[in-house]
Each structure stands twice: as C-alpha cells, then as structure tokens.
C-alpha cells in the first residue's frame, strides 16, 4: 500500500469510527495479538478493588472503562485533560455523582494528597 492509499484508508476509517472518549469498540474483533499478555489490567484492578475503596481514574478518556468496573459512583473520581473528553465526562460522569475534575495537563491532580485508596 502506498502513502496515498494508506491516507485514504485512514480517512475512510475515521469517517465510520465515531469515537467518543476512549471507546474503540468499532475495532473489536479486527485486531488480534499473536501472544496473550501475561497479565490482565481489569483482573488486577478487580482483584484488589472493593466497594468501599475510593477510586481515582486519571486521564479517564470518556470514562467508558471506569464505568465498566461498576464501582459505586459515590466512591469514584476521575480526571481528564483532552477538551472533547472533558465535555463528554461532564455530560456522562457528573450526572451519575462521579467526582469529575478536569486535569491541568501538567500532572498536578486536583485532589488532596491521600484522597484515594486506588489510582488507575
């Protein structure tokens, strides 16, 4: 595939993707790993996370993965810095009672030290 064909393919993919946040479900089943990873991110989180724990998701995207964990909303917080995702989080996370705060893009968290039991 030459450069122009590759760019055309990317543009065609972009037109059908309709990505919001970090939801890449439109590529499910289209990419496979040759070797499975020796660990599973979700499994590690679920092994240690209990309902009473305070959870912070840094750079949550649109909050899709965070919401999929099913953690009690009152014990859940998230940050995001990318403006389109900040707007999405305000629309989806705040109404649920999740403590969402935009990040500053410099790595400074808008929460007091020691506020969380788990940070992902």
Q: What is each model feature region?
A:
Residues 7, 100, 118-120:
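S-adenosyl-L-methionine-dependent methyltransferase catalytic core, i.e., the SAM/SAH-binding region
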Residues 106-118:
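A short acidic, Gly/Pro-enriched loop at the edge of an enzyme's catalytic core
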Residues 24, 32-54, 64-68:
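Conserved alpha-helix/loop element of class I SAM-dependent methyltransferases that forms part
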Residues 1-26:
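N-terminal, positively charged/glycine-rich alpha-helical extensions of SAM-dependent methyltransferases
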Residues 54-57, 61-108:
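Class I SAM-dependent methyltransferase SAM/SAH-binding core
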Residues 51, 72, 112-114:
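Residue-level preference for short coil/turn positions at secondary-structure junctions
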């Amino acid at each position: 595939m030459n450069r122009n064909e590759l760019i055309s393919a990317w543009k065609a993919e972009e037109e059908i993707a309709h990505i919001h946040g970090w939801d890449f479900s439109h590529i499910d089943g289209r990419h496979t790993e040759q070797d499975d990873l020796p660990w599973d991110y979700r499994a590690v989180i679920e092994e240690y996370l209990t309902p009473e724990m305070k959870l912070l998701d840094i750079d949550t995207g649109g909050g899709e993965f965070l919401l999929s964990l099913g953690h009690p909303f009152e014990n859940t917080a998230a940050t995001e810095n990318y403006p389109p995702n900040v707007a999405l989080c305000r629309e989806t996370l705040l109404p649920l009672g999740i403590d969402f705060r935009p990040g500053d893009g410099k790595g400074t968290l808008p929460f007091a030290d020691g506020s969380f039991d788990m940070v992902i």
